[in-house]
Curated annotation (Swiss-Prot):
Pathway: Lipid metabolism; fatty acid biosynthesis. GO terms for molecular function: acyl binding; acyl carrier activity. Carrier of the growing fatty acid chain in fatty acid biosynthesis. Gene3D superfamilies: ACP-like (1.10.1200.10). Its main location: cytoplasm. GO terms for biological process: lipid A biosynthetic process. Pfam families: PP-binding. PROSITE patterns: CARRIER (PS50075), PHOSPHOPANTETHEINE (PS00012). It is found in: Cytoplasm. Residues 2-77 form the Carrier domain. This is Acyl carrier protein. 4'-phosphopantetheine is transferred from CoA to a specific serine of apo-ACP by AcpS. This modification is essential for activity because fatty acids are bound in thioester linkage to the sulfhydryl of the prosthetic group. InterPro entries: ACP, ACP-like_sf, PP-bd_ACP, Ppantetheine_attach_site.
Amino acid sequence: MSEIGERVKKIVVEHLGVEPEKVVETASFIDDLGADSLDTVELVMAFEEEFGCEIPDDAAETILTVGDATKFLEKNAKS
């Protein structure tokens, strides 16, 4: 996992309280990690804060897995 991927993983573990080994690229926030819609909004906000970028609503709707978040942030992160 990339450095950004590791940071994404850390945020997911902290916000969802899941075991780190469950946070893999293909893990769905809702189906695999037990997030609800509020959790996903909070994750997006945490990603924005951690990486210094804005995630527009239309982009946020496409971030369904850990891998989706990592790919988006690798392209758009400022820090």
